[in-house]
Amino acid sequence: MKSRNGKRVMQWLNHFIEMAKLISTMSKDPSKKIGVVIVDQHNRIVSTGFNGFPRGVEDSSERLEDKDFKRAITLHAEENAILYAKQDLTGCDMYIYGLPPCSHCAAMIIQSGIKNIYYRIPDEYKISDHWKENLAIAETILNEVGINLLDM
């Protein structure tokens, strides 16, 4: 019975990671496309998000190619998913396709009450030293509060 339930759990995990991958394709970012699915305790989708400019802000190719401009205003997929959720996220799980959460998003995740984060990094994504340091901070604070961060 346990192996059957374990297989079913893996099916759900893979299902939601694949959904996050599909949602990541909505991002217009030319270098990194990140997608998020937030799911409640009953495997119901609560919210989704992808990285991009705030609504109403022109996302022309010129602006998307301007790294300083893009970094200054882009909302991360985790932020968008949390902002668009219309219910309490306490106890929910977050699935991320692209990169694990940065330190700022980790802080938002902590405040939202999400309990587990599952992520998958595409093989073609390279992580800079700056981001590695930031991701290490994120992992530290998530571990400190007992949020599971699991690489799929």
Segments predicted by a language model, with ranges:
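Zinc-dependent deaminase catalytic domain
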Residues: 1-152
